[in-house]
């Protein structure tokens, strides 16, 4: 007989009053195979959103749930859907039909949901089949997958409507519709797709909307798909960010690079870190800069193949990489409209008002980003997103290298750390208005409004009972590193950034093909594929990787030199480098005195001339 243990692992009697009513996964009447999978995944008890939503979904009601990031919303809708499919298979084992359609705004989130389905159905894999339509396969392969009628379909709205219009995706037997991250779906440009899907989905389908916020976009989706839904406004959402220590540093534009170098080289931040920058060029500039000091990092942006992006996140969660530089460029390239914009799908999106239940935050809390001088067409995938939805695990620090343009985006960024009751740190680098534009090579347009955005962020966090504290560095100790930062930053030219950007895209395209083909058959070799290799700017200065002892702060020496720091070579050997280079050039046919191929004349005509 199993004993019920409380949170302190102390056995509780059955008639212990209110504690006996505490919900567990067993009390939710889930299939034993699902319970076994939950135990394998180390799920001890349901979170608030799971305890409230699962019984409602099992009873057949439409649900609109607001819960914070990392609260377990994915399991809250997947478990009851899997339960209903298993019950259907018990009644009719041979029946095949598409029972659930799960819509997500990004490919990364689709892959995450697909992995969750596989995990939860690990002990009933023969009965549960799922398909991810966002994977880049040929149309013929996708039609073959859909023709087999998998039980669960995960897709973006665009892919779903394409397959529906081509009759590849049959929704006639659909019983469940899920819209995950519902507040983002319309702001990613899927409004027309959602309206078309609303016409294609049969009546009576149970609809579940999951969202971190309740915005007017969620209300629009509720009107399209739901029938008198039960609205869950969980109080647990009030605790979002409670375990995050928030700091801000005011610095010049080039000092952002200096502070970042000092933070990671002196190990002022322990653990994994996500660095948010404004656009893709900034991500490669920062990566090349850190490479000068031997600091490895991964770049995550919309230009990389989706397989590579997913693999980077997976390896980061496993602890293979410690630093991710994420290009959160949605606001910079014009995808978030200006105030007063009449765009239907975005007028109340990222810069939009929130209803009264969202603590009274409104458009006045957002700062409009400066207009771009050159309106270039964006090459960014609309189904890419990094600051929302993706399940980054055990992130110790979020570094806002470039401050976002809205207080809401700031909240979503720092939500990558301090998840599941853990603590975290968020550090933002702020450029004062009087220092903006002083250093042209590192200047960034959105930094012009940093102080105004910071004021709104402080105001919003204060309403939540939290504080953004100033982070004070010892300027005298930091100035000692300034000349090294200047040398490294000078080497990272615009040409070097473009070359690195092109090189990594080509390499990741190759890696992406390998991920799809070769590594499916050789999973052990997948570990050899790394995304944090050096991109090599035009001028490499090996001495910058070593920090001289005289630059080390007194308090930091013990921590960094307690162990063997190893041999630091400066590429100097006992060989004569000039003689070695001369021999190498002679072998390449670049001239020389002994037997060079095409290296000039074999004999001096003046020396062979004889006069009598």
Swiss-Prot record:
- What stretch of residues is annotated with the motif DEAD box? 180-183
Q: Which domain of life is it from?
A: Eukaryota
- GO CC terms on record? cytosol; nucleolus
Any Gene Ontology biological process:
rRNA processing
Where does motif Q motif map?
A: 23-51
User: Bias regions of kind Basic residues — which residues?
Assistant: 579-600
Q: Which residues form the Helicase ATP-binding domain?
A: 54-232
Query: Which residue stretches does the UniProt record annotate as biased composition, category Acidic residues?
Result: 351-368
Give the region (Disordered) as residue ranges: 335-383, 576-612
InterPro entries referenced in this protein's UniProt entry, alphabetically: DEAD/DEAH_box_helicase_dom, DEAD_box_RNA_helicase, Helicase_ATP-bd, Helicase_C-like, P-loop_NTPase, RNA_helicase_DEAD_Q_motif
At which positions is ATP bound?
A: 67-74
**PANTHER family given in the database record:** ATP-DEPENDENT RNA HELICASE RHLE-RELATED, DEAD-BOX HELICASE 56
Q: What is this protein called?
A: ATP-dependent RNA helicase DBP9
Q: What is the lineage of its organism?
A: Eukaryota, Fungi, Dikarya, Ascomycota, Pezizomycotina
């Amino acid at each position: 007989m199993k004993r019920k243990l409380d949170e302190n692992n102390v056995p509780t009697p059955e008639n212990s009053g209110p504690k006996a009513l505490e919900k567990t996964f067993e009390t939710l009447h889930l299939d034993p195979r699902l319970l076994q999978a939950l135990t394998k995944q180390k799920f001890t008890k349901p979170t608030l959103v799971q305890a409230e939503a699962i019984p409602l979904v099992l009873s057949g009601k439409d649900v609109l749930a607001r819960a914070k990031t990392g609260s377990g919303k994915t399991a809250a809708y997947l478990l009851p859907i899997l339960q209903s499919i298993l019950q259907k298979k018990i009644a009719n084992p041979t029946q095949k039909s598409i029972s659930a359609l799960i819509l997500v705004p990004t490919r990364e989130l689709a892959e995450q949901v697909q992995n969750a389905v596989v995990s939860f159905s690990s002990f009933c894999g023969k009965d549960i089949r799922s398909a991810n339509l966002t994977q880049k396969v040929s149309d013929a392969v996708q039609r073959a997958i859909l023709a087999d009628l998998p039980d669960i379909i995960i897709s973006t709205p665009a892919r779903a409507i394409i397959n529906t219009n081509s009759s590849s995706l049959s929704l006639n037997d659909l019983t469940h519709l899920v819209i995950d991250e519902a507040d983002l779906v319309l702001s990613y440009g899927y409004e027309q797709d959602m309206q078309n899907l609303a016409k294609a989905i049969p009546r009576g389908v149970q609809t579940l909307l999951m969202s971190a916020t309740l915005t007017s976009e969620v209300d629009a989706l509720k009107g399209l798909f739901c029938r008198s839904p039960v609205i869950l406004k969980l109080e647990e959402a009030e605790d979002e960010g409670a375990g995050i220590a928030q700091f801000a540093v005011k610095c010049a534009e080039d000092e952002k690079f200096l502070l970042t170098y000092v933070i990671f080289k002196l190990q002022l931040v322990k653990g994994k870190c996500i660095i948010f920058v404004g656009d893709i060029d900034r991500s490669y500039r920062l990566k090349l800069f850190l490479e000068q000091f031997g600091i490895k990092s991964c770049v995550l942006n919309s230009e990389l193949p989706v397989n590579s992006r997913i693999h980077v996140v997976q390896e980061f969660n496993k602890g293979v990489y410690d630093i991710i530089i994420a290009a959160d460029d949605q606001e910079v390239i014009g995808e978030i409209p200006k105030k007063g914009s009449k765009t239907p799908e975005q007028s109340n999106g990222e810069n939009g008002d929130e209803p009264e239940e969202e603590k009274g935050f409104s458009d006045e809390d957002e700062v409009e980003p400066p207009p771009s001088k050159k309106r270039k067409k964006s090459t960014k995938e609309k189904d890419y997103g990094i600051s929302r939805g993706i399940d980054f695990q055990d992130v110790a620090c979020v570094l806002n290298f470039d401050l976002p343009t809205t207080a809401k985006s700031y909240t979503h960024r720092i939500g990558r750390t301090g998840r599941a009751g853990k603590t975290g740190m968020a550090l933002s680098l702020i450029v004062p208005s009087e220092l903006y534009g002083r250093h042209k090579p590192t200047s960034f347009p959105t930094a012009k409004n940093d102080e105004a955005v910071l004021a709104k962020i402080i105001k919003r966090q204060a309403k939540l009972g939290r504080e953004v504290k100033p982070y004070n560095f010892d300027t005298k100790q930091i100035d000692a590193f300034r000349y090294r930062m200047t040398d490294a930053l000078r080497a990272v030219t615009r040409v070097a950034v473009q070359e690195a950007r092109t090189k990594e895209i080509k390499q990741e395209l190759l890696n992406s093909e390998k991920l799809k083909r070769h590594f499916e058959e050789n999973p052990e070799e997948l570990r050899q594929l790394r995304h944090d290799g050096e991109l090599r700017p035009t001028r490499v200065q090996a001495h910058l990787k070593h920090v001289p002892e005289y630059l080390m702060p007194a308090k930091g020496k013990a921590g960094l030199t307690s162990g063997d720091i190893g041999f630091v070579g400066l590429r100097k050997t006992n060989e004569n480098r000039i003689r070695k280079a001369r021999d190498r050039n002679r072998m390449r046919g670049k001239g020389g005195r002994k037997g060079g191929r095409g290296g000039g004349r074999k004999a001096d005509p003046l020396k062979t001339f004889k006069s009598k």
